[in-house]
């Protein structure tokens, strides 16, 4: 049986994984449509590697592969899009 590599990130409204939260398994080119634009202060990467971006359409991004209990000030409440990254060599 073929097993699919699942990617999952959980985002939080406050530092230290507090406040409202939401999980994503897919790319979101505008978090505004999900009610999460510029609201994320901490996050947990449950599986995979992710790209978080300060602008819609995946612009001004950085790659993350682990939990962040306190996003740096220039990323706190500044994320507008996110997407899972494929492992190296995957089509």
Q: Regions from the language model: what does each represent?
A:
Residues 1-91:
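Compact beta-sheet-dominated domain cores in extracellular/mature segments
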């Amino acid at each position: 049986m073929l097993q699919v590599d699942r990617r999952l990130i959980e985002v939080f409204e406050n530092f230290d994984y507090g406040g409202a939260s939401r999980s994503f398994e897919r790319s979101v080119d505008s978090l505004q449509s999900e009610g999460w634009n510029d609201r994320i202060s901490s996050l947990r990467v449950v599986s995979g590697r992710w790209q978080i971006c300060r602008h819609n359409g995946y612009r001004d991004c950085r790659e993350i592969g682990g939990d962040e209990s306190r996003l740096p000030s220039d990323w706190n409440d500044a994320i507008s899009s996110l997407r899972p990254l494929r492992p190296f060599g995957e089509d």
